[in-house]
A protein has these predicted regions:
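Catalytic core of the metallo-beta-lactamase
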Residues: 1-68, 147
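Accessory terminal helices/loops
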Residues: 46-59, 66-147
């Protein structure tokens, strides 16, 4: 269990591989945001530290990638050593308080993801779509005046 991005985040360690979902991204991007429902920057830092305590040779597979401007191709695999040495926000030596301050300040500048409302509706239903309405249409309903 590696909460922080959301309270439900998990990391699966199988042999020399760790599947971290959205907890960590590639070192040149940093970790996940922590401002989603139930997210917590301090819990995220502690989860990342548990991941970074794995052996240096452990391969990390990220859930998705946001290539920065100086990297044109998406990536999906990194290592504990690369994260410790090069992660722009949580490399070795970053204190918990410094990380929490940075993460919370940065999260305040980020817009909500474009698909957050439909994603929340499906997540709340444990991945199930709502029942079909008359005419056999399955619809997600979005509020027009609130998030």
């Amino acid at each position: 269990h590696t909460p922080g991005h959301t309270p439900a985040c998990l990391t699966y360690v199988i042999g020399d591989a760790a599947f971290v979902g959205d907890t960590l991204f590639m070192p040149d991007y940093g970790p996940a945001r922590a401002d989603f429902p139930g997210g917590d920057a301090r819990a995220l830092y502690r989860s990342i530290q548990r991941i970074l305590a794995l052996p240096a040779h452990t391969r990390i597979f990220v859930g998705h990638d946001y290539p920065p401007a100086d990297r044109t191709k998406p990536a999906w695999e990194t290592s504990i050593a690369a994260q410790r040495d090069h992660n722009v926000h949580v490399k070795s030596g970053i204190s918990e308080d410094a990380f929490v301050t940075m993460r919370e300040a940065r999260d305040q500048t980020l817009e909500a993801p474009s698909l957050i409302l439909p994603a929340l509706q499906v997540n709340i239903r444990a991945g199930r779509l709502p029942p079909a309405e008359p005419g056999h249409k399955v619809q997600l309903k979005l509020p027009v005046n609130a998030i």
